[in-house]
Design a protein with these regions (language model features):
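Alpha/beta-hydrolase fold catalytic core
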Residues: 1-43, 65-67, 292-312
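Active-site loop/oxyanion-hole signature of alpha/beta-hydrolase fold enzymes
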Residues: 70-111, 115, 289
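Hydrolases whose catalytic domains are alpha/beta-hydrolase-1, hotdog thioesterase
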Residues: 119-123
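Flexible "cap/lid" loop of the alpha/beta hydrolase fold
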Residues: 125, 132-168
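Catalytic histidine-centered segment of alpha/beta-hydrolase-like enzymes
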Residues: 269, 275-288
Length: 312
């Protein structure tokens, strides 16, 4: 497969942080580029809530020699004490697109995970001439009831951060972190599958180590937007697309992800066995192989532990 790379990125081989000025502020964006000629279109990685540009170390090791990576830390959708300045999905989509302008990337593939999926979806829907391939994991038309309830709880906690239920001390933060992880992951599956349990533990440790209330941070980052039309009407056409989910995912179920895939013309839908919502962490090698095969346009039938179907 012949693809057009980015000369600008090739001139910045290795791993670099860039400042992306956007509107009245700016945000950091990590690029990881192998040395050599610009032969592959970059992959724009849109992380889920509470992830950063440094959350993809394993993925980088698996794929950075194959294609350039662009991993923005998009601005939080909500700023503490400044609810009136909340950003919308359209704003975040514009911010992500702006990074490609600043880095002089004309065409790119998109990987959207969890709450990064609504941004990736909108990019493909509105810019099919620029998005070469679309991959979404952990996608849902609307948040599951438990997650919606937890987001509402976070909004109430944010409204009065000095309330008795605010996670002010380390024990409170740990309790809030456990509550969040228990909703975002399948705790029953974690008891049977060590890789799922280990991924949940990594996220829990990261949340508990933060000085912020994990639930309020999740709401600010993008969580509250999940209550506001994450899946826009109109569908996606003209962009080769893949939607994937772990079979044990209870945050965005197999049915949820299939419903999103059904809005994308000709999408490939994959269910990865022995995986949960954090499948890119739990099954990092298999996840990277899947992404590389799809980006290269190679058959996915060689993948083990996956079921594959094609949407009409």
């Amino acid at each position: 497969v012949t693809r057009q790379g980015s000369p600008f990125l090739s001139a910045h081989a290795g791993a670099h942080d860039h400042r992306i000025p956007w509107r009245a502020a700016d945000y950091p964006c990590r690029t990881v580029v192998a040395h050599g000629p610009a032969s592959a279109e970059p992959l724009l990685v849109l992380s889920g809530g509470l992830q950063t540009r440094h959350s993809w170390g394993r993925f980088e090791r698996h794929v950075a020699s194959r294609f350039p990576l662009v991993i923005p830390d998009l601005p939080p959708a909500r700023t503490p004490g400044q609810a009136a300045q909340s950003l919308s999905w359209d704003d975040l989509t514009d911010a992500a697109l702006h990074a490609t302008h600043r880095l002089r990337i004309s065409r790119f593939a998109v990987l959207g995970v969890s709450s990064g999926y609504p941004i990736g979806y909108r990019l493909a829907q509105r810019h099919p001439d620029r998005v070469t391939r679309l991959m979404l994991f952990g996608a849902a038309p609307r948040p599951a009831p438990r997650l919606a309830e937890l987001i509402s709880k976070g909004l109430h906690r944010e409204a009065d951060s000095r309330s008795p239920c605010s996670a002010e001390g380390p024990p409170d933060r740990l309790r809030a972190a456990r509550e969040l992880v228990s909703v975002l992951t399948n705790t029953e599956a974690a008891e049977r599958h060590l890789l799922i349990k280990a991924a949940g533990r990594v996220v829990l440790d990261q949340l508990a180590a933060s000085a912020d209330d994990p639930l309020i941070r999740y709401v600010h980052d993008r969580g509250f937007l999940l209550l506001r039309n994450p899946l826009p009407p109109g569908g996606v056409r003209g962009v080769p697309s893949l939607v994937g989910v772990g079979e044990f995912d209870t945050a965005t179920t197999v049915a949820d992800n299939r419903a999103v895939a059904a809005t994308i013309s000709g999408a490939t839908f994959i269910v990865m066995k022995n995986a949960d919502h954090l499948l890119h962490m739990e099954r990092d090698a298999d996840f990277a192989t899947l992404v590389a095969l799809f980006l290269d346009g190679r058959p996915l039938s060689t993948l083990q532990h996956c079921t594959i179907e094609t949407m009409p």
